[in-house]
Amino acid sequence: MNVPPKQAGPSIRAIADGDTRERLICGDCGFIQYDNPKIVVGAVVLWGDRILMCKRAIEPAYGRWTIPAGYMELGETPEEGAAREALEEACAKIEIGALIGVYSVPRIGQVQMIYRATLIDGAFAAGTESLEAMLCAWDEIPWNEIAFPTVRMARDEGSRRGRAESQKILESDPGN
């Protein structure tokens, strides 16, 4: 969140000159706080015909399975972010491939970019944000324990296409 360096006065909610949306504005210095969507990056990581899955050790969706994914950091590309998340969550070094899909989740202010990737050397383990990590054959994936709908969508599209062909808009609760 951007905040003015020396905010002395109270923030007010108003529409700034030349803008069309209500935003928080510092009553003293006029600093405008823009709240923008967060970018989530991740990868459907393959090792042969198996998919790398992580069991979450953090909320939301503690104890549910997901692909390695998380918030993109400043100063990194989406591809670098997806590779970093695989290393953090599954101790996995990956080679990023094609973009599978871009998923807009406006209700929670997220844009999710999911890539196809390959595990480089077959090595993986549960990282600090994961309870477990495993390579699953398609029929071994714990379908009833998947953390987020966009994981299912990316997995399904990744298995069919391997690249992005359309943008999906998810209006439902991503925690279900």
Task: For each feature predicted by the language model, list its residue ranges.
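A broadly conserved sequence feature marking short terminus-proximal activation segments
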Residues: M1-A16, G158-G162, L170-N176
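Acidic, metal-coordinating catalytic segment for phosphate/diphosphate chemistry
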Residues: N2-G42
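Short secondary-structure boundary/capping segments
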Residues: I15, A43-V44, F124-G127
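Short connector loops at helix/strand junctions that flank enzyme active sites
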Residues: R21, N36-V40, L46, P60-Y62, ...
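Conserved hydrophobic/aromatic beta-strand scaffold that supports enzyme active sites
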Residues: R23, V44, M53, I114-R116, ...
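Conserved Nudix-box catalytic region and its N-terminal flanking loop in Nudix hydrolases
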Residues: L46-E88
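Unchanged
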Residues: M72-I96, G101-E157, S166, G175
